[in-house]
């Protein structure tokens, strides 16, 4: 039955390649839309265990807020939800909120832990509202403790204020295969 295993492996590679190109297609169209409007670009990249979508906080939220603020953000999350629905069953999404090193000025959040976790939860709630199975999602927060850029300039702080969606396979044996198929899809 090694032929069956090869068939299954080929099918799962085709599925993953389709998932990757679906993501890339969605991101290309969103990036074009955002680029035309002058908004900062959403990034999509490989990670050690799968892939990551990085969303600038100012696309999603007003300063020091965790309330999703605009139609572009809601539309993008709706598209992400449609893509998540097509992922293999063992792939989950961890939504992580990040902030810069400055403490929130609003009284709603006493610190960056509260702000970054509230932002991650807002994104997860929206994805669930858009039809994603809650079992495929987690929300977590890093506050200011995983900066993407320097916190010494406004430009750097802006890059640090973000929400990341990490897609990983729960099947440990598949992690290397998932990453390989993601890399293969880029060629």
Language-model region placement:
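Short terminal targeting/anchoring segments
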Residues: 1-24
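Terminal low-complexity, intrinsically disordered regions
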Residues: 1-2, 185-187
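Stable alpha-helical elements in mature extracytoplasmic
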Residues: 19-22, 26, 30, 73-76, ...
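Short secondary-structure junctions
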Residues: 33-40, 87-88
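Short edge beta-strands and adjacent turn/loop segments
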Residues: 40-55
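Periplasmic OmpA-like peptidoglycan-binding domain that tethers envelope proteins to the cell wall
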Residues: 63-76, 85-86, 98-186
């Amino acid at each position: 039955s090694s032929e069956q295993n090869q068939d299954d492996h080929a099918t799962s590679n085709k599925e993953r390649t389709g998932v990757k190109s679906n993501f890339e297609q969605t991101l290309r169209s969103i990036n074009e839309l955002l680029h035309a409007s002058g908004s900062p670009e959403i990034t999509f990249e490989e990670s050690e265990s799968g892939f990551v979508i990085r969303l600038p906080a100012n696309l999603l939220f007003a300063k020091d807020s965790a309330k999703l603020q605009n139609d572009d953000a809601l539309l993008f999350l709706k598209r992400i939800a449609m893509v998540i629905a097509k992922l293999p069953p063992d792939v989950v999404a961890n939504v992580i909120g990040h902030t810069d090193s400055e403490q929130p000025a609003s009284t709603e959040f006493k610190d960056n832990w509260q702000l970054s976790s509230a932002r991650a939860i807002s994104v997860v709630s929206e994805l669930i509202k858009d039809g994603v199975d809650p079992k495929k999602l987690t929300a977590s927060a890093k506050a200011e403790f995983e900066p993407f850029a320097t916190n010494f300039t406004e430009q750097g702080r802006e890059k640090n204020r973000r929400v990341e969606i990490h897609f990983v396979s729960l099947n440990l044996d598949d992690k290397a295969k998932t990453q390989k198929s993601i890399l293969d899809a880029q060629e």
